[in-house]
Amino acid sequence: MERREVESFFERATSIRALVVGDLMLDEYLWGRAERISPEAPVQVVEVAREDLRLGGAGNVVNNLAALGCQVSVCSVIGSDENGALLRRALEEKGAGLEGLFEEGERRTSKKTRVLAANQQIVRIDRETKSSIAAASEQGIIDYLAARSGDFDVIVVSDYLKGVLTPAVLSAVCRSGRELGIPVVVDPKGNDYGKYRGATILTPNRKEAEIASGVAITDQESLQCAASGLLSCLELDALLITRSEAGMSLFPAAGGAVHIPTVAREVFDVTGAGDTVISVLSLGLACGLTMADAAWIANVAAGIAVGKLGTSTVAPQEIVAEVGHGAKDSDSKIKNLDVLAHAIAREHSRGKKVVFTNGCFDLLHVGHVKYLQKARGLGDILVVGLNTDASVRRLKGEKRPLIEETERAHILAALDCIDYVVLFDEDTPLKVIETLGPDILVKGGDYSIEGVVGREVVEARGGRVELIQFVDGRSTSRIIEKILSSY
């Protein structure tokens, strides 16, 4: 998605009404310094300098959705204790609707205390009740869902296995969503995913998907196998598996998996990143985005979230800025690899056939142009990988290139047959091919198919290699020789 499309999405988000059903908790952070060892035991002494109390669990989903601009209501159970009162007050401050919030006198409101020093967690202390909610609370939630589900555009289920999401509650949620045509988006937990049957989409991480499916995920084939099994037995519309540094993989029930690479960045804390994913994904589906576009924006948001310490929200302007990063001119065809990866994932999600070729393209001539035009004719999108100046020098000698990389890139981008240009500094485009996953890999007729770099990668994904003959007598070297001999 381009920057303007993302901005338009967030403008529409302000009218969305979301219901969050799940386990609420408080996240307490004690920030300090650990510069000495206790004389009482061989443990660090943390001198607390700052304390911070935030909404956690399903509360962090509420926090994220509110930060993204939509109207949020809560359906859950807390204790009639001090932490419950603090949690209720925090939700009220976010403007959340609390008609579906129930209390139990004997229940302990979940609170997780994290002690940090030098931006590192030292210990976590949990205070909580994990047993299922009382029958009266369960019936209260079911009645609330029956009466109020139609008031919302999306239902978000945040399961932390703290007892709120009983089988009866989950059944009521999924039934309401199906009957009313409302997306039900679930962040699952535990080994038994049968309780989520009938939801719209689940967002497990790789490890959770392995446990739930019983398939060890080691490559693309096993990933697809795990996803297919879960999709069929749970009657889902789609499955989104988050894969840490490998990004996300979206598996629609109708077929056509979409793999969304992550944007490389320094990771400070993954706490709450899953809450960010489900919040943005849910909002996207409620706004009518395709599954692929909603997942793509969620991936961008998650990349921002892991760069922050603690359960933090991601603001719309941060996501918009990240989408625009590396592409100051939104109309430019010249992209860095991270930005291009997102663009190509979106093209794939639309069923477009992506063609990739590469070269130095130093002193562009008619042979190059005809070659590129033929390559474009093989598919819908043509991506050209362009060797940087350093790469050209290693391949062709210190006197090359004649034209520096920025100018070569702009010359190529001016051709109508080219959709994207990406520079690469390596001797081969293997990294680019692995990242983009083109459907067709094109090289000149002087190559053999077996010798084309990246062939195995493309063919393993169901793609193919094509060889295109060059125009006889046309080459940069011959042009240089003619200039030297004639002038």
Swiss-Prot record:
Region ranges (Cytidylyltransferase): 356-487
Keywords: ATP-binding, Carbohydrate metabolism, Kinase, Multifunctional enzyme, Nucleotide-binding, Nucleotidyltransferase, Transferase
Pfam families hit by this protein: CTP_transf_like (PF01467), PfkB (PF00294)
Residues forming the catalytic site: D275
CC annotations in GO: cytosol
Disulfides per UniProt: none
Record pathway: Nucleotide-sugar biosynthesis; ADP-L-glycero-beta-D-manno-heptose biosynthesis; ADP-L-glycero-beta-D-manno-heptose from D-glycero-beta-D-manno-heptose 7-phosphate: step 1/4; Nucleotide-sugar biosynthesis; ADP-L-glycero-beta-D-manno-heptose biosynthesis; ADP-L-glycero-beta-D-manno-heptose from D-glycero-beta-D-manno-heptose 7-phosphate: step 3/4
EC number: 2.7.1.167, 2.7.7.70
Single GO MF descriptor: phosphotransferase activity, alcohol group as acceptor
GO biological process: ADP-L-glycero-beta-D-manno-heptose biosynthetic process
Binding site for ATP: N205, R206, K207, E208
Reaction catalysed by this enzyme: D-glycero-beta-D-manno-heptose 7-phosphate + ATP = D-glycero-beta-D-manno-heptose 1,7-bisphosphate + ADP + H(+); D-glycero-beta-D-manno-heptose 1-phosphate + ATP + H(+) = ADP-D-glycero-beta-D-manno-heptose + diphosphate
Function according to Swiss-Prot or TrEMBL: Catalyzes the ADP transfer from ATP to D-glycero-beta-D-manno-heptose 1-phosphate, yielding ADP-D-glycero-beta-D-manno-heptose.
Family: In the N-terminal section; belongs to the carbohydrate kinase PfkB family. In the C-terminal section; belongs to the cytidylyltransferase family.
Oligomeric form and interacting partners: Homodimer.
Name of this protein: Bifunctional protein HldE
Gene name of the encoded protein: hldE
